[in-house]
Amino acid sequence: NQNYQAKYNTSVRSYQGSQKEQTTLSNSASQSASSIEYFTKYYAGLYKMDEGKINEIVKIFKDSAVKKQMNANETAEMVITFIQEIPYYLVHDESCVKAVASGNSFVKQYHASNKPCFPNVKGGVQSPYEFLHNLKGDCDTRSLLGFAILKKLKIASSVWVSEAYGHSILGVGVQNGHGIYKTVNGIKHYGVELTAKGYRLGMVAPENNNPYNWDITVYNNY
């Protein structure tokens, strides 16, 4: 086990720029024929939008990996732990009242417990830079940030979504993995839960462990 501490900066102007562009991306992706196609287009657009804005945080991970002589697996675990340490914050694309009225039992129970949420976000997902700026993220906001950082670190990664589970996790293409995986163009991507601490590569909640209930949206292989 190793401890990590890092400091990075974000700006309100860059954050607001991402918010403004996000509306256009969401409207464009909404023409998709299916929810999987929508999220694939939307996630890809959000990544491209923020690709240049996350260089500072990527450099922190890259420098740390070099200094500590980490392999790809260890570097991925470092990124995963960083995201897991950020407290959970439900993000949804409507008001809290509408989210409760149309949401599943998790959403209803979450609001009934007066837990924190971030309403009126297009598609119910924040972009990588937006999340780094305000630290408000649920499942797919976290998965997209993990994908964005790992992609820039040249580590194979993917964002998984499940209509059956109403959930999203990160996939990472590593050597000698264990646990749940999906093969993406010949490379095994191991799933990992990012909304709670302690999950390692290949580990998800028991109720979410059927790989056939997961679809791959954006991905990259190196």
Residue ranges and their predicted role:
Residues 1-222:
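A structural boundary/capping signal
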